Design a protein with these regions (language model features):
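Positively charged, small/polar-rich N-terminal and surface patches that mediate targeting and assembly
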Residues: 1-111
Length: 111
């Protein structure tokens, strides 16, 4: 089992991403509001105020999607994400990382 974590920079793609996951039979995910460290530093700490100029055009908030998936769905899920947001090699399209999950508690283990 794998945990796919996707930090979505463009919130307007959220519904389309979730629909793409459903087409792959990925039926569960948790969506969190998230903010990058640079945004916080630029807003709240005067010494880092120069970050504001560097971050013009970037979004202050993101959506972070967490979903547990079988290993055979990792590459199809990444491909589905890229079909919606564009290449993840391009800055600003988002960030995906995959973690191994050894044990799961609190949900059905048959999915």
């Amino acid at each position: 089992m794998k945990l796919l974590v996707f930090i979505l920079n463009k919130e307007e793609y959220l519904e389309e991403i979730l629909e793409a996951f459903l087409e792959l039979n990925i039926t569960g995910a948790t969506i969190l509001d998230s903010v990058g460290m640079g945004s916080i530093l630029a807003q709240d700490i005067p010494i880092f105020a120069g970050f504001k100029n560097l971050m013009k055009g970037s979004r202050p908030a993101n959506k972070t999607i967490l979903t547990l998936i079988p290993e055979n769905l990792v590459q199809p899920a990444i491909k589905a994400i890229e079909q919606v947001v564009g290449s993840l090699e391009e800055p600003g399209n988002g960030l995906v990382f995959i973690l191994n999950v050894d044990q799961i508690f609190g949900i059905s283990k048959t999915f």
